[in-house]
Amino acid sequence: MKLNIFASAILLCTSAFPVAASRLDKPYTEVYRPQYHFSPKENWMNDPNGLVYDTDEGIYHIYFQYNPGGTTWGAMSWGHATSRDLMHWTEHPVALRARGFPDNITEMFFSGTVVVDESNTSGFGRKGKVPWVAIYTSYYPMEQVLPSGKRVRKDQQAQSIAYSLDKGMTWTTYDAANPVIAEPPAPYHDQHLEFRDPSVFWHVETSRWVAVVSLAKLHKILIYTSQDLKQWDWVSEFGPANAVGGVWECPSIFPLTLDGSQQDKWVLMLGLNPGGPPGTIGSGTQYIVGDFNGTTFTADADSIYDGSGPNDGMIFEDFEGDESLAARGWATTGDFINASPVRGTLSGQNAVTGFQGQQLFNTFLNGDATTGAITSAPFDITYKYINFLVGGGNDINETAIRLNVNGKTVHASTGSNDEHLTWQSWDVSSLKGQRAVIEIIDNASDGWGHINVDQICFSNTRATNQIANWLDWGPDFYAALSFNGLDRDQRTILAWMNNWQYGAAIPTDPWRSAMTVPRRLALKTIDGKPSLVQQPAGRWRTSGNHGREFSFRAVDGVRPLGRLGKALDIELTFSSNMSPSNGLGEFGVSIAATKGYQYGTRVGYDFATQQVFVDRSRSGDVSFDATFPGVYHAPLSNSANGTISLRILLDWSSVEVFGAHGEATITSQIFPGPDAVYGQLFSSGGQTRDVSLQVREIQSTWH
């Protein structure tokens, strides 16, 4: 749960796109209203909270961060909804309303968990009724003495509990003793403003309740145990590890079997804000695989990253030292004649991060107006991979690093319109023995008209651009939480489908924010290490049993598909054996596109980098925040059978992509125009073969 005050100014849409829905519209038919994702009837929503499955009644309960008084963050309370199938939802009255709402708020209810206390360890049960217990963060906006007699400071965050004797429909706060964890333990007393988001479960082997709570700014998770949910003992901590670009929030920990065997591993999920996946701006969710003994979480070595890149092979260029580019053996043109590597961020540039050592090649010398190129001395290709760090502009024709063989470009890469440098790799195994040069070009002079490059190295190991295991590589997946009460092999999560960067500005009304589709998790060995995979858990009603099917022996260029619809379940498979010209090749489908295809969302696969991508740069209304348009990538290796498969879930204002078995996912909001119901296939850089496409139109779950 993030304490965040958004800027109140929201840019209006241009006339090309619909303005926010009118409150006079029929509920759940408003412009951009999700048709099969949960969203509240009205007002602001963020983190999912207290997800629990009632095994007796067969009902899923979701609680969520909710503002009962408006469409921006504030007056944090717990909303509530239920479903029997994870698809059709009934919204209920607010479960935990901010104390003193609306005019004299003394306590807000931040994120937390609900557990079913079957053995009545808490003692809250009465007359045979099993208590449900909510464990949440209390946020106190003012110094005060509580009904329990405990004194809290202004803006303090502490952990409290409430209980329900009617299966989660109404709640009683434990005012006699709240908060039950008033402050962080002694070493961290000064962190009482950043101590939040308890996730609680019953640990069978030790017969104890376990809670994980975030020390947000320190990138630490505190682990507590309890026998009764009232008295808690701090037993260990974990962190920092992997991604630490922003605060850690919304932690949770749970077991999964590895590869469907009897071997258990434990997964720690963590929200990060900002500092999400490469190419995104704002929040994201990472995970770490390891072991848990009831008190201590120990990460697997292969689940932790140091970001240093491969340690074999040779460094071709690290841009360190005092020599000019020409003195280092680079041929220079344009503004790069007499230029030298630079020490990080230049005047007028956003912070440049992710490079190694003290220096890098940064073409922002005189701002984006700088143009030119540098070309390395020729070299023989003797290793399997060429690895490098790259950031900056995302224009393959204007701002790129290229590999040229015999005067032809065989590989090229760019940044992601982001100043953070990430690892990219070219597989040059088929080019061994040939002579090549590396060229870095900057022919662009407008926004993002620059490129950052560092640490070019030759290796037999592909570099990873990962600093973390990302649960989702898109910009709109945060605060993921799993349901308590389900069997281990049914581990199911929801996440907030929005981003703190622009969440209060998205053009929706009278509600703001939706949840992702529910996703079933599994743990599988991929590329030699345990990795989370996820698949949609719902079965939505579609138009017809098979929908529309397309089959093409080969696609080259574009192939219009006609009118497809606004809410779709798409399955796309194609051969991974494309031989792209000039080292460049993409295949995919444009969806939610206008009739003339001036606007649309591109979902596809980059054969050169082996990445699935979502491009929402021209998806519709992107005017409300400068960081909203973008292209997002997730690594997806070729399959053993030589095919790539993508499942794409399109709703009225979102797209979720699941690559292969679900090891690569991208979640992205979009806000297309009213006529954006068309689609077309695209193949650039060569032919894509053996294309199969199935499109089913999903019916609304609200009507």
Curated annotation (Swiss-Prot):
Record-listed E.C. numbers: 3.2.1.-
A Pfam family assignment: Glyco_hydro_32C
Catalytic residues (UniProt): 47
Region forming the signal peptide: 1-21
CDD domains assigned to the protein according to its UniProt record, in alphabetical order: GH32_Inu-like
Gene Ontology CC terms, in alphabetical order: cytoplasm
Residue positions with a glycan: 104, 120, 293, 397, 443, 641
GO biological process: sucrose catabolic process
EC supergroup of this enzyme: hydrolase
InterPro entries xrefs: ConA-like_dom_sf (IPR013320), Glyco_hydro_32 (IPR001362), Glyco_hydro_32_AS (IPR018053), Glyco_hydro_32_C (IPR013189), Glyco_hydro_32_N (IPR013148), Glyco_hydro_beta-prop_sf (IPR023296)
Entries under SUPFAM superfamilies matching the protein: Arabinanase/levansucrase/invertase (SSF75005), Concanavalin A-like lectins/glucanases (SSF49899)
Keywords: Glycoprotein, Glycosidase, Hydrolase, Signal
GO molecular function, one term: sucrose alpha-glucosidase activity
Family of this protein: Belongs to the glycosyl hydrolase 32 family.
Protein name, as recorded: Putative glycosyl hydrolase ecdE
Gene name of this polypeptide: ecdE
